[in-house]
């Protein structure tokens, strides 16, 4: 925590060629003013051949406007390497908490409630917590999006061909991190999927929104994730 008794909260964004989605995150003043740093890990994945649909200088232009952006170029890297980069940076910068919010997602805070929630989490041993996320017109569910430091864990490559690699997150001693989210549900019962009464952390909500991506890009994304663990 800082000397002002506030938390150092960072945001980790896995990004490529999605400036409108990123702008949706950055232009929420409540979110931008509260967080300490926004780590944008830029780059097209290894093995993807689709071309960018927007001008690649957009990201540079945004970094000149939004000083909290910390941009790292990792073009040609695997998803797992890109996601591990923001954990590495959060560890170096000694963030207290991290929120994972990709560029096809956005979020909103009630800062007073969020700070109260983070104080509650300080006393808990788990490092992963659920956030209520909406996919408009499709589903509402609690997802692992809030993480507590120290950020000594990393994603490990899955041994199963049909498992997305960033779903595996482990400490060096083999402790699994994502599953720690379920400890929250023991005293905050999990709700039915699509129920608006999801038991996520109070003070933060997220939305999944692909409307800024073209139909071709959404299809290319789906094909890539289906074929690449």
Predicted segments, located by residue:
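Short, conserved active-site loop motifs that form the nucleotide-linked donor/cofactor pocket
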Residues: 9, 67-70, 126, 175
């Amino acid at each position: 925590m800082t000397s002002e008794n506030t938390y150092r909260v960072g945001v980790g964004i896995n990004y490529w060629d999605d400036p409108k989605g990123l702008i949706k995150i950055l232009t929420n003043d409540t979110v931008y003013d509260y967080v300490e740093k926004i780590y944008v890990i830029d780059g097209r994945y290894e093995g993807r051949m689709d071309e960018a649909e927007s001008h690649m200088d957009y990201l540079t232009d945004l970094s000149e406007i939004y000083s909290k952006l910390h941009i790292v170029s990792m073009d040609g890297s695997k998803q797992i390497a890109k996601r591990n980069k923001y954990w590495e940076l959060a560890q170096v910068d000694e963030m207290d908490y991290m929120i994972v919010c990709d560029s096809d997602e956005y979020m909103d805070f009630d800062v007073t409630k969020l700070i109260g929630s983070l104080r509650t989490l300080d006393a808990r041993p788990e490092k992963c917590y659920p956030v209520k996320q909406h996919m408009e017109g499709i589903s509402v569910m609690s997802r692992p999006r809030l993480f507590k430091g120290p950020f000594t864990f990393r994603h490990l490559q899955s041994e199963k061909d049909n498992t997305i690699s960033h779903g595996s997150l482990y400490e060096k001693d083999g402790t699994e991190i994502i599953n720690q989210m379920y400890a929250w549900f023991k005293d905050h019962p999990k709700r039915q999927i699509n129920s608006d009464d999801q038991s996520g952390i109070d003070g933060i909500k997220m939305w999944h929104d692909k409307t800024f991506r073209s139909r071709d890009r959404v299809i290319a994304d789906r094909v890539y994730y289906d074929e690449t663990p």
